[in-house]
Amino acid sequence: MSTGKNNLLYSCIKKAKAIVKKLPPVQYAREYKILSGSSVLMLHRCEEYDTTKLLPNEILKVSPQYLEQFIQKASKTHTFISLDDLSAPLPEKPFMVFTFDDGYKDNLKKALPVFEKYGVPFTVYVTTCFPDYTANLWWFVLDDIISSNSVIKTSDGVVWDCTTKQRKIDVYMALREIILKFPADDFENKFTEYFSGYKINLKEKAKELALSWDEVKQLAESPLCTIGAQTTNHVNLAEMDDDAAYQEILQSKQQLEEKTGKQVSHFAFPFGTANEVTEREYRLAQKAGFKTAVVSFGGNITDLSEKTLFKIPRKMLVDVYHEF
């Protein structure tokens, strides 16, 4: 994770608070922006909002009910296509592509039934450490610690005031910056040590929330679902040397193809902002044999060419009915 991702989260929080204050006008404004033109949508989870948890994580959810309502509304003006259909020349009618990042269980349990009901194609970009259950989903563990305590103490002696919802969010964001600096090669030990006063099991959180390999295969068997890749460890590729970055990209493709028995042609850059994705990363994705690659910023799709197919912009779909 990176400063760019942090800025994205702050931006999401700001937008979410604006939604609360101004509903319904902002609701329609937000959807109007998404529905204006052709675009690829970025989602992460399809699950009900948990009011006991924190906004930086909950903002990444859309409820099954909202997803269904959004599809109903978008179907009046847009054609739903898969990434495999995304090629020049562009369709005359505005189109929309649904994509999910990381690989959460609710993509199968909650999102798939909605897409099946309306016959809408979608893509799930799987980070292979998720179904391997080696992913350190620390942001959810941190949320659990902060949400369930009014005060927390870290091993450096700092006492953090978590008495209000806003303070909990502020503490989450502050601790997030500290955690992002933990060494990758000893992350689990460092995280556990830093929160030594609390019961922590990072791998259990992965088993709770991440797709298993059997579940990835179930998704891959759906004619509506395309499985894409998102590296093996959800790392910031821009911080890696050429060979290491290339192996992160290539090995995720190879592992997913081996597990699903299907060709994996589409890639999502982890974090995906301009801070983590440069021209080198675009070239590496193309070199690995992908047909497309998406980023986490941008707007409408107005042009498709060999070059732009590896920097496809996305819009983040936010559930405007969440009670923030």
Question: What are the residue ranges of the model-derived segments?
Answer:
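Metal-dependent polysaccharide deacetylase catalytic core of the NodB/CE4 family, i.e.
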Residues: L41, E47, E116-N275, I312
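Residue-level marker for buried hydrophobic side chains located in beta-strands
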Residues: F98-T99, I227
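Alpha-helical segments flanking ligand/cofactor-binding loops in enzyme cores
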Residues: P113, K217, Y282-R283
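C-terminal active-site subregion of NodB/CE4 polysaccharide deacetylases
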Residues: S2-F98, D106, L137, E221-S222, ...
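Beta-hairpin (beta-strand-turn-beta-strand) motif
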Residues: L86, D101-G103, T127-C129
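Short acidic, Gly/Ser-rich segments with clustered Asp/Glu that frequently serve as metal-coordination loops
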Residues: D102-K109, V114
